[in-house]
């Protein structure tokens, strides 16, 4: 019986190079290919795939991957049924844990979370953000960061043109 192949999810994007460096320091050589999400790794029992960090927890939960590197924020956001094996403290710019913050301009009238009651909050982590404000009994409307209504290019006529 052949040895099973371990399916590993590596983050693409800003954590891609720091993750490859981390594996390099551990003795695994990961070699990326242009326009290909399946880098080579110098271990015949491992196959790697570059994935969005947001998707890695769900890919593990669904059995597409056996393990992967992602943030606890995305495990919490996706509510994926996975086991966190280890905390790896690294990022694209430091060796400190990443953190999500509520940011406003210094001269903003909003200086504490309660000041945002009834406002729209744009975030990548809608579930985490909603839960944060709900735990504090602050009613807000969360939306995906960058989401905008699609512009209407035409006006629907009340009578279809084919009648």
Question: What residue ranges belong to the model's regions?
Answer:
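Domain-level signature for soluble enzymes in the chorismate/prephenate branch of the shikimate pathway
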Residues: 1-163
């Amino acid at each position: 019986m052949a040895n099973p192949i371990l399916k590993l999810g590596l983050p693409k994007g800003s954590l891609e190079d720091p993750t490859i460096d981390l594996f390099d320091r551990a003795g695994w050589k990961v070699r990326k290919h242009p326009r290909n999400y399946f880098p080579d790794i110098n271990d015949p029992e491992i196959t790697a795939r570059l994935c969005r960090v947001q998707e890695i927890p769900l890919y593990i939960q669904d059995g597409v991957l056996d393990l992967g590197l992602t943030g606890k924020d995305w495990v919490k956001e996706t509510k994926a049924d996975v086991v966190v094996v280890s905390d790896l403290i690294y990022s694209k710019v430091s060796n400190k844990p990443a953190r999500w913050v509520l940011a406003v301009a210094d001269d903003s009238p909003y200086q504490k979370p309660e000041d945002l009651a009834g406002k729209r909050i744009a975030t990548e982590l809608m579930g985490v953000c909603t839960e944060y404000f709900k735990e504090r009994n602050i009613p807000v409307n969360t939306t995906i960061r960058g989401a905008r209504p699609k512009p209407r290019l035409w006006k629907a006529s009340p009578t279809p043109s084919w009648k």
